[in-house]
A protein has these predicted regions:
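Small, basic N-terminal interaction modules of short regulatory proteins
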Residues: 1-3, 8, 79, 97
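Basic, Lys/Arg-enriched alpha-helical interface segments
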Residues: 3-57
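Basic/aromatic recognition patch in beta-strand/loop cores that engages polyanionic ligands
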Residues: 48-78
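Enriched for short, Lys/Arg-rich terminal
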Residues: 66-69, 74-97
């Protein structure tokens, strides 16, 4: 099984989401972050099952949706690399992987 590696950008995005949610509900912020990390860490179990990210239309770049978030990742030869985690409320054209 390939290891899952989180990009610095993905970690920063989760931290930013946590900070935003925390202002409204600290308990929900903890739940969201824990769930996103848990799901991301399990992407190495059949990573091809998730849809191809339409912004890139590359079979290597896929996403896992959860609530209003997308975990975007790339399937590489030796690892699963999580590129970013973002809210689907964001303007997708501003997202850079």
């Amino acid at each position: 099984m390939k290891p899952v590696v989180w990009s610095p950008n993905a970690i920063e995005s989760i931290q930013n989401s946590y900070n935003y949610i925390y202002t409204k509900s600290p308990q929900n912020a903890d739940l969201v972050v824990k769930t996103l990390f848990d799901l991301g860490d399990k992407l190495n179990v059949f990573p091809e099952k998730n849809p191809i990210e339409p912004l890139y239309n590359s079979k290597e770049i896929r996403f896992f949706p959860k609530w209003n978030f997308k975990i975007v990742y790339r399937i590489e030869k030796k690892r699963i690399y999580i590129l970013d985690v973002f809210s689907t409320y964001q303007d997708l054209k501003k997202i850079k992987f």
